[in-house]
Amino acid sequence: MSKALKVGLDGGPYALAAGPDGAMWVTLAHSGEIARVTETGEVAVYPVAPQARPSIIAAGPDGAMWFTRAGDDRIGRITVDGELAEFELAEGSAPFGIAAGPDDALWFTAMTSGEVCRISTDGEVTSVAVVGGMPSMITAGPDGAMWFTINQGNAIGRLETDGTLTVRELPTPAAGPVGITATHDDAVWFTEIGADQLGRIPLDEAIQELELPGKPHAVVADPDDGVWVSLWGADQLARVSGDGEVVTIDLPSGSEPHGLAIGPDGAAWVALECGFVLRMPN
């Protein structure tokens, strides 16, 4: 079993994703930067723009990392060598979630304009669906569609690459869904930060909900079974098995855990907005 690794990182670590280079790439929302963190804790920081507010980051099909810039309405791209590019969006769109799709493109949500959009690896942006309700995080589902949370619409959206949209309302009022991930059991899991619950949709079946106090924020699939969840309001991580068994891990007070990702070795990483990234033992 490997040991836990705690890496100090100023600038408000918010989200992170594993890159094709074996490192973890982190958005620094407060300072407007992107950081690269190796499995041994070595750090490199790349300035983007002070007002950019980098939010969610994902590995693209082109070998680069792509991220949303909610503060200045842009999509950013950074190569593993640190070369940056940006693609301007409509003013006030507030891009947030982003994920690689099955079509060799990136898909992202625009919270303020209420859109789900596609951006090709050469920067061509297409608005595919206008859903309203503040679409938040997005993931590629096991069925070839993009699934996303609609935070203020209290729903989960499913968008096929041809633009076919399905919206499913949540059974709990004002649940405030945020994080979302697809798992190897052909299901989609999501967090309900307003209801202190974790949701699961086995594709075409009924929505399932599990009580999970602590303001669950992000969720990521565990390669072995189940999911990891950041409990932002409780300064905890939760490990939830496929059959719903919950184990919580306490973090220091004031940690503000947000984004989660799985490293190349299967270990879970979490971004702590207080100024650290943490790699869990595996």
Curated annotation (Swiss-Prot):
Gene Ontology CC terms: outer membrane-bounded periplasmic space
Keyword annotations: Antibiotic resistance, Lyase, Magnesium, Metal-binding
Binding site for substrate: H217
Active site: residue positions: H258 (proton acceptor)
Binding residue positions for Mg(2+): E256, E273
EC number per UniProt: 4.2.99.-
Keyword Magnesium: yes
Record family assignment: Belongs to the Vgb family.
Name the UniProt record assigns to this protein: Virginiamycin B lyase
Organism of origin: Mycolicibacterium smegmatis (strain ATCC 700084 / mc(2)155) (Mycobacterium smegmatis)
Underlying gene: vgb
